[in-house]
Amino acid sequence: MGPKLLESRLCLLLLLGLVLMLASCQAQILSQKFYTQHIYNSTYPRCDAVMRVVNRYRPRCKDINTFLHTSFADVVAVCGHPNITCNNLTRKNCHASSFQVFITFCNLTMPTRICTQCRYQTTGSVKYYRVACENRTPQDTPMYPVVPVHLDGTF
C-alpha cells in the first residue's frame, strides 16, 4: 500500500506541475505574440523564412499572416487613437492607424507535417491597419500602459 500511495502522490504532484506549466504557456504574453506574428521592421522578408518563427509555436502551419513593417512603439501609439469596433463586431477595443505602412502578406501554398518546412507566397503592399489593444499585463514592459494584442485587419 505504501509504494502505491507514494506513486499516486508523485503522479499527482507531477500532474499539478504539468498543469501549472501548461497554464503559464497558455498565458503567453499576448503583446509578445503580436510582436512575433506581426512586426517586421526591416526590408521585405521571404515568408518561408519568417513564418518558421511564427509556426514554431503552433501545431500546424498558419494559413495566412500579415507583417507590418513598422516598430512596436509605432503600433503602441496607434493604441492611443480613438476606439472603433473590431471586425468581429463584439469588441470595441480596436484602433486604426492614421498612416499607411509597408506590409508583407504570407499565404500558405504548401503545408507540411513539419511546421518549419511549410511554403508561403509572399506579397507586398502599402496599407493602413487596425489593431486590438488591451491594458498591459504584469509581464509586459511598464513602458507601455496599453499594448497591441491582435492585428484586426489591413485596409
From Swiss-Prot:
Its EC number is 4.6.1.18. The modification 3'-nitrotyrosine is found at residue 57. Residues 1-25 form the signal peptide. Substrate binds at residues 33, 62-66. Pfam families: RnaseA. One of its GO terms (cellular component) is lysosome. Disulfide bonds join 47-106, 61-118, 79-133, 86-94. Glycans are attached at residues 41, 83, 88, 107. One of its GO terms (molecular function) is nucleic acid binding. Transmembrane segments: none annotated. The active site is at 38 (proton acceptor), 150 (proton donor). Its main location: other. Gene3D superfamilies: Ribonuclease A-like domain (3.10.130.10). It is found in: Lysosome; Cytoplasmic granule. The keyword ATP-binding does not apply. It catalyses: an [RNA] containing cytidine + H2O = an [RNA]-3'-cytidine-3'-phosphate + a 5'-hydroxy-ribonucleotide-3'-[RNA]; an [RNA] containing uridine + H2O = an [RNA]-3'-uridine-3'-phosphate + a 5'-hydroxy-ribonucleotide-3'-[RNA]. InterPro entries: RNaseA, RNaseA-like_dom_sf, RNaseA_AS, RNaseA_domain. Keywords: Disulfide bond, Endonuclease, Glycoprotein, Hydrolase, Lyase, Lysosome, Nitration, Nuclease, Signal. It is an enzyme of class 4 (lyase). Interacts with and forms a tight 1:1 complex with RNH1. Dimerization of two such complexes may occur. PANTHER family: EOSINOPHIL CATIONIC PROTEIN (PTHR11437:SF3), RIBONUCLEASE (PTHR11437). Belongs to the pancreatic ribonuclease family. This is a non-secretory ribonuclease. It is a pyrimidine specific nuclease with a slight preference for U. Cytotoxin and helminthotoxin. Possesses a wide variety of biological activities. This is Non-secretory ribonuclease. It comes from Mus musculus (Mouse).
